[in-house]
Structure formats: C-alpha cells, structure tokens
Amino acid sequence: MAKIKLGIAPIAWTNDDMPDLGKENTFEQCVSEMALAGFTGCEVGGSYPKDPVVLKKALELRGISIASAWFSSFLLTQPYEQVEKDFIAHCEFLKAMGAEFCNVAEQGNSVQGKLDVPVFAGKPTNTEEQW
C-alpha cells in the first residue's frame, strides 16, 4: 500500500496576494498549527524564512517538509533571461529544501493582487503573438 502524505498551503493562514488577510499570523504560528492539524507537508509562503538552513530547522522541529512552492513567471512582460534566472534560483531553493515539485503560473499582465482592477471588466487579453 502506498504511503500518502498530506500537505497544505499557508494561504489558509496568510494571504500573499492580499497581505492584510492573516497578517497577524506569524510563520511560526502557521507551521505549528499545520503540524498540530496533522499535516506533514506544505507549500512555501511569503512569510517563510528565505534561508534554507533556517527554514529546514523550523520545519523539522515540527515534522513538516516542503512539498512545493509557487513561482510566478512573467514571460509576457519581462525578458526571458531574467525569468529563466529567477526560475533556476527558485528551483535551487526547492531542491535545497528537498521538494520535488514547483507550481508555475504565468502572471504577466495578471490582475492578481491589483485590487483596483475589476476581475472581468479589467482583465487583459493576450495577442496572437503572446499566445
């Protein structure tokens, strides 16, 4: 029988897109409550330590490991070389954390995090060339 591990995203405690939501929840509270709830894996959140040694120590104390992390690519709005450099650095961080997965989404021209832009009326559309 396969062993299943259960993980959760820290967005249940803090919201990286809307930082006012959950800003009172510290990293330590977030991962402690994850562990108390029985989770053994999690995504990386914006409030997490950026140093793999520091992050690993805090997570190992609670029996949690990093399962993945979100990567926002901006291929539509930034030079490819910059996006590639950022992606490689992100993957190296994940590898140092023992993660095997990376969640990737194109965010160039996204309305995400732009609270003054209507989701439907203000959404951009890609040109044929961008597709």
Question: What annotation goes with each model-predicted range?
Answer:
Residues 1-101, 123-130:
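N-terminal pre-domain/capping segments
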Residues 113-126:
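Active-site gating loops and adjacent loop-to-helix segments of metal-dependent hydrolytic enzymes
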Residues 105-110:
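Short glycine-enriched loops at secondary-structure junctions
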Residues 98, 111-113:
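Conserved anion-binding
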